[in-house]
């Protein structure tokens, strides 16, 4: 075995090194300044401790604090410091798990008396002390027996359970920070001092051990950490903005929807909210129609045999709502399920009747109501529900048509997002996972096509960021994931394009090829909004409730100053409605400022104020949401202007093109 390794650096240069050299020594050999800034290193994309030996040849990178990958290390290390601080302050507390999550980290603790928000400042202060000590992170590999004995002696029963769960043959890594240690896969930075002080503990919550309600309840402490104070403050400011924009609060203020205990995870839509929902459906329906989709509707309840054939019963049964039927003899003992996905139903529609290669591509779309079980603790307004509407479509095509169809889908998705003001989009290709169906040759072809498509997308637009997610594809094929950035910088994964070799084969779907032989179609799953409910939640928060005029459930309120203007206000409202606008009149005997405040709280885009003078002159005083300005104009002028603004963007393009 060779004692030297060949390392390729980011600039393309290749050098030989002793295999036993550590990452820290490698950084030192390049430059002392780099060694000071280094927090970890990576070989062939795998991040390692600086204390790890090189071991093997590959592409090497020194990771500094400025590298995006360092953020996960900072948060991981901060979680360990949190655990140490808790055990210093509250002896007898057991530590369990503490992973990095999106935008931060958490750690779960077992303690007789749960932590409260009042404990967080004290814990945070102790964490800063530990960081100031600048203790090195060091790693040891223990035997299973030693690990169980040590943690058992410490009274750490949860850690003993974690040790038992680690597969035989896998190293049991123990990381020390000074004298304190924890079971951990790593990697870590060189010392606690490299964490810095740009962190904050955010909240406490209850969490069942291993997410099982039959297990003990633990206390979870959430925190966040960043590479510098500017990033931390920007994040905290974003959270403040997000709280102001919370769609649940705005939903109440705007009278859009509500939830209640008798229907956990399902939406009670009020009239205004349902109007907004229908606006979204109508817009999407027009877009699909113009792109050659056929809208269909498949049953919501189907026999489990269909779900067994599709594979959902085996892969997804625990997340499905099951129904047993106590009917006549033919129905006894049958088990049905509410559909969690639309795809199996669409395959049945495709199979109904013989299809020729000349018929392809066939594009089936549905605004399908689906139901998926989510733990009650995971439910979150419109963003995480149990019953929702999916803007699903499935394109049945030949393998040769796959690239062109993926590009057409991409054009449609980006166009829809642009119409709602989302132009910062990231598209990532998720490639084959370890567990998958289909031959490697089939995956090679599909990934090659989608890689080419991704490159074409990247070249077409400067606003589009692209990337690869190795091993993150569905078991049945590779997929694109579309993530959009909202007005306050948050990212939301919405659209998907997934290639499926599996479902057509499972159901025996085929078309007749040019050679008169049966061929299996490629099936492309496509969603733009994803969950329509969730997309509406995103829109409400993105616009802070101030929806574009064309999308608002109530577009105009005609409000009177005095009763002298009541008849004129009714006449004005009738003309506005006749022009196609969504109008409400407010003739109440209230002061006009009170009316304006109330309708502004409900985020009505335009208020037309009518008094005695306006009634005499056939004018209106226009006030827009968020503006102090008032503009006087004739009623006809107001109607013309508002009708233009209230035209949906897709129809406006058609109008301008004509």
From Swiss-Prot:
Enzyme class: ligase
Record region (Catalytic): 246-548
Alphabetical list of SUPFAM superfamilies matching this protein: Class II aaRS ABD-related, Class II aaRS and biotin synthetases, TGS-like, ThrRS/AlaRS common domain
Cofactor: Zn(2+)
PROSITE patterns: AA_TRNA_LIGASE_II, TGS
Protein biosynthesis keyword on record: yes
Sequence positions that bind Zn(2+): 343, 394, 525
Domain (TGS): residue spans on this chain: 1-64
Name under which the protein is recorded: Threonine--tRNA ligase
Organism whose genome encodes this protein: Brucella canis (strain ATCC 23365 / NCTC 10854 / RM-666)
